[in-house]
Amino acid sequence: MSRKNFLHFPIITNGNMALSSITSSVTNIQRLDNIGIQFNWSGAPVGDFAVQISADYAQDTEGNVTNAGNWTPITLSPSPATSSGSPIYIDMFQLSAPWLRVVYTRTSGSGTLQATIVGKMI
């Protein structure tokens, strides 16, 4: 039986939700079928989360960005907002784009954000 790809690591650690926005690190999701992102926060932030994908972002073998790429938000229904309460978990299936990141956009309030991504090949 062949080895299946799997990932699990933080993409935002101690994000300051009093800032106008927080952008996660970029994650390579090639060869992964299912992706999940969990957001946990403390405090009383008000804002929205977006998942963005890119087909033209690029890194060299050392992880240096060689093309910042163009980022497109995925339509999520309903759009995840802090008003839903912490934690929020987003499950995504069969994404075709090779790169993913998340963005929190503040409306008001403040808090501290943690976000973790998981992914697996089926």
For each predicted feature, which ranges?
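Edge beta-strands of jelly-roll/beta-sandwich modules across compartments, strongly enriched
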Residues: K4, F49, V103-M121
